[in-house]
Amino acid sequence: AHIRVVSHEVNRGLSAARNTGLAAARGRYVWFPDPDDRYDFTFLQSVYNSLQQHEAPVVMVGHVEEFYDAGGKVKRVQEFTFSQESAHLGKTKLRKHVLEFEKGTHYGYAWNKVYERSYLQQGGFTFTEDLPLIEDIEFNIRVFQDLPGLNVIGAPLYRYAKREAGNLTSKFVPRYYEVHRARIEMLRNQLDSWGLLDAGAKATLGALYARYILSALERNKQKESGMSGSAQKE
């Protein structure tokens, strides 16, 4: 059969579900779309065309972020595309673009990428469980560490839904600051291992770090945090 359904008896979270699906997969490439998102009807055809032009272990596409209010209405739309419409990047070139990908919110997601299953298997790549918010970027940093090549499709073919209610990124997460500090540290270590941690990279990482600090402070002020005034100051 072309379609098989696999499930967990109890909800073990996103990473565990992806790992189970990855273990059950038989196709050459795997994709991890979120169930409440949408994508252009040409998404898979565009990925196929890209791979026909140049094989690669990973294909990354542009995306649109749709911000929904509590009533389910779209209140804002933002596109995230690449400077090039379509391209193949070898190991050296893709490494030089990683920080640009992170700034453009491309690097940290799994749903905007299609992965060659054999490459994931050979590298032993699976998603780390019980790692809120940064499971995708942690996975991608490991996958990209020795990635020999990457195909990029500039068109925004994936539509990511960000909702005021129900989306993990909109919920209060007690360890928000700690996990994003870990995110910056992982990026720093990767760039350093590639010999790309120059002054410009440090400045960019510093700006990203400052953004996460401000975001953490804002979240601590939310009533959902349950934090007292003294706890917020700490």
Question: What residues fall within each predicted segment?
Answer:
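Short aromatic/hydrophobic "clamp" motif used to bind/position activated sugar donors
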Residues: 30
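C-terminal subregions of glycosyltransferases and related glycan-biosynthesis enzymes
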Residues: 159-234
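Donor-binding/catalytic cores of nucleotide-activated saccharide
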Residues: 14, 35-153, 158-177
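A generic secondary-structure signal
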Residues: 20, 46-50, 186-193
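Glycine-rich, basic loop-to-helix element that forms the pyrophosphate-binding segment
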Residues: 8-25, 35
